[in-house]
Every structure is written in C-alpha cells, then in structure tokens.
Swiss-Prot record:
Belongs to the DCK/DGK family. GO terms for cellular component: cytoplasm; mitochondrial matrix; mitochondrion. Its main location: mitochondrion. GO terms for molecular function: ATP binding; deoxycytidine kinase activity; deoxynucleoside kinase activity; nucleoside kinase activity; thymidine kinase activity. Changing R183W: In MTDPS2 and PEOB3; reduction of activity; reduced affinity for ATP. This is Thymidine kinase 2, mitochondrial. PANTHER family: DEOXYNUCLEOSIDE KINASE, THYMIDINE KINASE 2, MITOCHONDRIAL. Residues 20-32 have a biased composition (Low complexity). Its EC number is 2.7.1.21, 2.7.1.74, 2.7.1.-. It is found in: Mitochondrion. Keywords: ATP-binding, Disease variant, DNA synthesis, Kinase, Mitochondrion, Nucleotide-binding, Primary mitochondrial disease, Progressive external ophthalmoplegia, Transferase, Transit peptide.
Length: 265
C-alpha cells in the first residue's frame, strides 16, 4: 500500500521536472556526472557557516564508535543511520527481507533507504557541525552498486534508482564537506559483526563484506568510476577500541575545524 501514493507522486514529478525531462536522452547504466543547480545566495552563505561530515565505511567498521566519540563535542549534532526505520515500515522489515533474499527485496529496501537518507540530509541543521553515519551517496555508490554488480538487482531497477539519485543531486542540497573513511579489513569487520550478533546480520557472509570493501576502495581511495562527494580523510580502523579512540582524538581538528579539512589527502 505504501508504494501506490509514491508512484503517483513520482509520476507527476517525472512529468514536470524529473529524470529524463527537457528532452534529455536516457543513457546507459552506471554513475554519471551530474550538474547541480545553483543555490540562492542566502542558502550558500548559511552553508558556509555550517559543515556536514559523513562517516563512511564497511559494516562493523567502527562508525558508531566514531559518532559516539564526537557526540559530546561542542556544537556538533550526530545523525545515525535510520536503521530502526528500515527494520519497521508499518510492520514490515525490508532490511531483514533484503538480507534473506536480495534479488526480491533489494529495490524495495534501497528505495526506502534513499528516501530516509534524503530526509537526513535535508532536515534543518541546528549545530555548526553535522556528523552523519553514512550518506545518500554511499547508499547509491556502495549498496545499490553492489546489488547490481552481484546480479541481484535487474538493470531496469538499477537505472530507475540511478535516475532518482541523479535528480536528487541536481535539485536537492545533499552536499557534504568531508568524508571520514574508516578503512577496515573485511575479516576484521566479519569478526566484529559476529560478536555484536545483530539479528539481520547473522546471514551476512565474509564475501559480502569483501565486495562492500572493494567498492569503498574504488570510490574513496582510487577515485575511479564514482564522483567524489567531498575531500576524504582516511583513518585505518582495524585497531582495538583504545587505539581507535586515540586516532579519533588525533584527528579531531582535521574533522571538526573547517580550515583543516581543506588539507585532507
């Protein structure tokens, strides 16, 4: 029932100004460079005073630990992934369904992920620094891409999601000022994942984590195929908790101070 009103709204949006409008030809699958709209001067000035930082990384790479570390910093707001929403959409659990049958439920989950992450990006920012767990960019470049490459998402589903993502980039402000990449060995993630024992994650194999790691490397290290959403600060995150907290402290200024972010490699 949830999809019917969305379909009607989507059809109207597409006719008016959505993907493929103005006679632009449809292109093949795959990420594309997207021309973003120019934002009003007052919005640009407001953005100059505020920063959005996304913490990216594999499943169980330490993102929650990173967010918790900086959550007590002055004038920092933290937005976690809306996992609780993905687990319960009017009584349904699309996250759990996707992990058990990605071919059937991949599009369902990723459509909702894109919507909820868009909500995260566009909600009013009350602090100077917003720290987000992942982003709408990694939803597209990592998780949608993995479903498609692994053969679990048909090309038509992939193209439709990509068209919506490109439209969002052109028409909505989902910009990011810095990406903190917690670079973690897939085997380390797998061991951590087994220890925390979340219900939906019990079926995740090591091969899945390896595929997700490979896509993060393509996007954030090699800079190949995918557009870079922001400068990237890489933190090696295979270490134990105490060492990770030390690394977060060492990188505090590079993460929270705008002038220092410009010098991130």
């Amino acid at each position: 029932m949830l999809l019917w009103p969305l379909r009607g709204w989507a059809a109207r949006a597409l006719r008016c100004f959505g993907p493929g409008s103005r006679g632009s030809p449809a292109s093949g699958p795959g990420p594309r460079r997207v021309q973003r709209r120019a934002w009003p001067p007052d919005k640009e000035q407001e953005k100059e005073k505020k920063s959005v930082i996304c913490v990216e990384g594999n499943i169980a790479s330490g993102k929650t630990t990173c967010l918790e570390f900086f959550s007590n910093a002055t004038d920092v707001e933290v937005l976690t992934e809306p996992v609780s929403k993905w687990r319960n959409v009017r009584g349904h659990n699309p996250l759990g369904l996707m992990y058990h049958d990605a071919s059937r439920w991949g599009l369902t989950l990723q459509t909702y992920v894109q919507l909820t992450m868009l909500d995260r990006h566009t909600r009013p920012q009350v602090s100077s620094v917003r720290l987000m767990e992942r982003s709408i960019h990694s939803a597209r470049y990592i998780f949608v891409e993995n479903l498609y490459r692994s053969g679990k998402m048909p090309e038509v589903d992939y193209v439709v999601l990509s068209e919506w993502f490109d439209w969002i980039l052109r028409n909505m402000d989902v910009s990011v000022d810095l990406i903190v990449y917690l670079r973690t060995n897939p085997e380390t993630c797998y061991q951590r994942l087994k220890k925390r024992c979340r219900e939906e994650e019990k079926v995740i194999p090591l091969e899945y984590l390896e595929a997700i790691h490979h896509l993060h490397e393509e996007w954030l290290i090699k800079g190949s195929l995918f557009p870079m959403a922001a400068p990237v600060l890489v933190i090696e995150a295979d270490h134990h908790m105490e060492r990770m907290l030390e690394l977060f402290e060492q990188n505090r200024d590079r993460i929270l101070t705008p002038e220092n972010r410009k010098h991130c490699p």
